[in-house]
Amino acid sequence: MEAISLYNGQRSAIFQSAKDFGSAGSIYMTSRTPRFTDGKKYNAKVTFKTGSFGVANPSVLFEHRLGEHVSGAFSSEYMYTTGKYKFSYKKKNGYDTTEVRKNGDVRALRAEYGVFGRMNDGEWKAKAYFYDSERGYPGASVREEPGKFKHQDRQWDSNFFLQGSFLRHFSGYSLQMNAKYAYDYLHYLSDPRLDVSTMYVNNHFRQHEIYVSSANMFAILPFWNVDVSVDFQWNKLNADLVDFVYPTRYTTLGAVATALHFDRFKFQASVLGTFVHERTKVANGAADDMQEYTPTVVMAWQPFRVADFNVRAFYKRVFRMPTLNDLYYTFIGNINLEPEYTNQYNVGVTYNRNFDKGVLLGLDVQVDAYYNEVSDKIIAMPTSNQFRWTMVNLGEVEIRGVDVAVQSNWRFCQHWLLDARVNYTYQKAQDFTKKESTYYGDQIPYIPWHSGSLILNGTYKSWFLNYSFIYTGKRYEASANIPENRAKEWYTSDFSLSKNFSWRKTVIRLTAEVNNIFNQQYEVVQCYPMPGTNVKFIINIEI
């Protein structure tokens, strides 16, 4: 993986697929493109990780030239862990129990191969990906009756996809095409002969997906671009269940966008059309067909020519259709699940400055305030098992929040460098579905009012020091904000130290990690305790 980018709303560039215009927030993962230096014809990297929970995690990466403008990359990884760890439950004037988390083992294999090509004013990529795993579900831990339930549920997954992309810039016109085929298999087993607390479930799910996309951008004037994008997606879900409806979904998306960029002012507007048709083998078993149009308006303004200070704002209407998993999976799916509609309002400021003198090299500050109106918000509520989540709608939700991100770069002497990043989020997400309910206006489940993180990356010659702090504040595990449903705030501190060694053309990096340094006993989801202090050791060899 070369880069991971997170966007609230959508990317600032209009040259993208139609699907990209439809997300309230997106994560973009960019595959690593091979780069060769000093006339090399290949790059190789071998990594091995081990540590707590019986972890064994070898991986290999091999990149090679296939021609002057074509290269290939093979990557593979195997991961095994017993998943066993101790955790503690304490109650004032009550029990003090230490247990061992069991049935959390994981065996996973990943393999992928990509081909990357460059051409005049363009590039193309193709990738094949395979993933196979088996894992156990530890299940919920009951405080008052520790060890009563064994939780022997198992899950097997196999995932495969082929995807390709083509990008070319012409005079006044740019073309981007994407295509993907994906196959996903899931086998879930719950056997009462192994765990008397459960019912017998032996489900097999198979999903197929075909996706094609074309984005076309036209340079009308030097300051004016227009984009027209069209996507088509086909999904099919099969399962060996009694009376299963075997759904097939056809989704067509079309987007028209325009962008104006002047000296210190930028403006974008787009309209996305979403057309969804479903059919099933059982009469009246499909969700209703949908046809929706959702607009977006984005603006950015730099008030001062001499300072990199910007004001930005956007409005976005989002339509979210429930996935086939949301609608049709056993124990999870809800055929009566309604689509989700969101109106997003965001205003923010950014400030960036580089310094020529002093220890502070650079400063980047981003502050955003937002207000979201959500109708029929889709949320997943945990049950007694990690596989069996329940999908439900919350009729009316209002979300008010502030995001703050500050990043700075420091040089204390010739070899001492420090990067620091602080993130803070305040979010008030209230449920206004039923005025007569006792929880009208309460915070929705599992959304904290306050959360944040601190990341420090220090470098001294060939030494690398990293510290990470994550905090999640008070929240509630159900719609009613009462003491019985309160989830405690939690925090973790992680630390790592690395050292590089060079020998001829080989670079060796040794890393030691300590996670959850202060052995915080916490739960992200009620009754699912997380690990305490744990360690990891990594050796990385690059040729």
Where are the model-predicted features located?
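N-terminal periplasmic accessory domains that precede
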Residues: 1-6, 14-47, 58-61
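Short loop/turn motifs that connect adjacent beta-strands in outer-membrane beta-barrel proteins
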Residues: 34-42, 68-69, 120-123, 169-174, ...
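Transmembrane beta-strands of outer-membrane beta-barrel pores
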Residues: 48-52, 78-82, 119, 130-134, ...
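Flexible loop and strand-edge segments within Gram-negative outer membrane beta-barrel domains
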Residues: 83-85, 98-108, 121-175, 181-208, ...
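Membrane-embedded beta-barrel scaffold of Gram-negative outer-membrane proteins
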Residues: 172-190, 304, 310-316, 340-400, ...
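Structural signature of Gram-negative outer-membrane beta-barrels, strongest in the C-terminal barrel
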Residues: 221-231, 235, 239-372
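Gram-negative outer-membrane beta-barrel transporters
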Residues: 362-373, 390-476
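C-terminal beta-signal and adjacent terminal beta-strands/loops
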Residues: 376, 418, 471-478, 486-488, ...
